[in-house]
Amino acid sequence: MQPNKPLVVALMGPTASGKTELAIDIAKKINSNIHNIDSRQIYIDMDIGTAKPTAVQQSQVNHFLIDICLPSKPINLHDFQSIAKTSIERDLEKKGLTLLVGGSGLYLQALIGGLNPPAVPPQKFLRDQLKKIDKAERHKLLKLCDPFSAQRIHPEDSIRIIRALEVFYATGRMFSKAKNMRPTPWRVLELGLNPENLTSRIQLRTREMYKKGLVEETGDLINKYGNNLQLLKTIGYGEARSMINGKINYEEALEITIKRTCQLAKRQKTWFRNKHNSKWLNDENALPEALASIYEFLG
């Protein structure tokens, strides 16, 4: 299939909605590659806790933007946008279409919504000072500087909170307002997946993560990158680390992870509803509906 004009199909939806499996099925049918737009699957050594496509799944369809950087060297939105656009444009030149998959709304908007994030380099001294502040106080500070970003960013997400404050202090502008919009050079078809049984899917997937070795993977990350790795504060890894450190037991870790994941899914659904104009797919007929939309879009 070689459409006349480049087409980007973006499959979005909350965590645990089944995007990975559906994306692979779609990609096989339309002979496309997949670009990962998940803010944590870009990191090496973070597999189980991010629900990264397995080696078998990745062997079925080419996946890009997975395992592109070390957890000890996190990248910001501007850096990701630059890397991702280069990869996507290269793929479009060869195939004429590609498939983006992810639940990270801001990352998706940076690629398909024309978002142009501020190119503010890391401010080491400022970051060091902000890291000394208690995370609750840090989030309160963000509320004062940038209420919209504070509402969108979870209080536990230290990386994004520090980045938003960094942009504010470096430019004098709110991170949420410092993003100019520019048109995307591609045709874009947005498809959404939001199954009715999402809560039970989250519960099942979280239990599977722990059974597959989330705690062991977290221990390996601690041994390799240190106990203070910022990404170890994210969902799943934060609870597993607390369990390793003897602060909570297995059942508590499981329960908190499920709760935090459900909260994330709620925020993701709100974002997609407010920021995107997706065609939402029926869970039972997602594949044929997706293919029909793609073929109709291609004409």
Swiss-Prot record:
Gene3D superfamilies per record: 1.10.20.140, P-loop containing nucleotide triphosphate hydrolases
State its Enzyme Commission number(s).
2.5.1.75
Quote the SUPFAM superfamilies the UniProt record gives.
P-loop containing nucleoside triphosphate hydrolases
> Could you tell me the Gene Ontology terms of the biological process aspect for this record?
tRNA modification
Query: What are the protein's GO molecular function terms?
Result: ATP binding; tRNA dimethylallyltransferase activity
Protein task: Catalyzes the transfer of a dimethylallyl group onto the adenine at position 37 in tRNAs that read codons beginning with uridine, leading to the formation of N6-(dimethylallyl)adenosine (i(6)A).
Q: What is the lineage of its organism?
A: Bacteria, Bacillati, Cyanobacteriota, Cyanophyceae, Synechococcales
Q: Which family does it belong to?
A: Belongs to the IPP transferase family.
Q: Which PANTHER family match?
A: TRNA DIMETHYLALLYLTRANSFERASE
Q: Where is this site: Interaction with substrate tRNA?
A: 104
Q: Which UniProt keywords apply?
A: ATP-binding, Magnesium, Nucleotide-binding, Transferase, tRNA processing
- Catalysis performed (reactions): adenosine(37) in tRNA + dimethylallyl diphosphate = N(6)-dimethylallyladenosine(37) in tRNA + diphosphate
Q: Which cofactor does it need?
A: Mg(2+)
Write down the superkingdom of origin: Bacteria
Q: Which InterPro entries match?
A: Dimethylallyltransferase, IPT, P-loop_NTPase
Record note on quaternary structure: Monomer.
Q: Does the keyword Magnesium apply?
A: yes
Is Zinc among the key words of this record? Answer: no
Q: Tell me the organism.
A: Prochlorococcus marinus (strain NATL2A)
Task: Summarize where ATP binds, as residue positions.
Answer: 13-20
What protein am I looking at? tRNA dimethylallyltransferase
According to the record, the residues making up region (Interaction with substrate tRNA) are 38-41
Q: Name one Pfam family in it.
A: IPPT
Residues bound to substrate are 15-20
